[in-house]
Design a protein with these regions (language model features):
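Alpha-helical segment of the N-proximal tetratricopeptide repeat
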Residues: 2-28, 32
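Structural signature of tandem alpha-helical TPR/SEL1-like repeats
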Residues: 15-27, 50-62, 84-96, 101
Length: 115
C-alpha cells in the first residue's frame, strides 16, 4: 500500500471513531514518508481527539517543519498549545498563521471590481 492508501485508511478509521487504528494507519504512511504533511496533520488531530495533547504538539511541530507555509498547520498547533494551557506559545503561533494568511492574500491576483 502507498502512503496515500494508509492515510485514506486512517481517515476512514477516524470517521468511524476508531482512533487507535487511525493512529496506526497514519504512522504507516509516515514510515513511507516522514514529512507527509497530510498524515502528520491527521495524526496530530487524532492525538488531540484522544486528549494526548503533548503528542499532538510534538507532531504539530514536525508538521510545521515539513510544511512551513501551511497556515492551517500553525493554526492547529496554536489550538494544541491552548488545550495545554500554553497561552503565550499559542498566541505566538497564531500570529504566524495570520502572517501566512496575509502573505497568501497579498500574493493572490486581484480581480477587478465592476462598477
Amino acid at each position: 500500500m502507498s502512503k496515500e492508501d494508509f492515510y485514506n485508511q486512517g481517515m476512514e478509521h477516524f470517521a468511524q471513531d476508531r482512533l487507535d487504528d487511525a493512529v496506526a494507519a497514519y504512522l504507516r504512511a509516515l514510515d513511507d514518508d516522514a514529512n507527509y504533511a497530510d498524515a502528520l496533520h491527521a495524526l496530530a488531530m487524532t492525538y488531540a481527539h484522544q486528549e494526548k495533547v503533548d503528542q499532538a504538539i510534538e507532531i504539530g511541530k514536525r508538521l510545521i517543519e515539513a510544511a512551513p507555509e501551511d497556515e492551517l498547520a500553525y493554526t492547529s498547533l496554536s489550538i494544541f498549545y491552548q488545550q495545554k494551557g500554553l497561552i503565550a506559545e499559542a498566541e505566538e503561533i497564531a500570529a504566524k498563521a495570520r502572517t501566512l494568511g496575509w502573505k497568501r492574500q497579498l500574493s493572490e491576483p486581484k480581480t477587478p471590481t465592476k462598477s
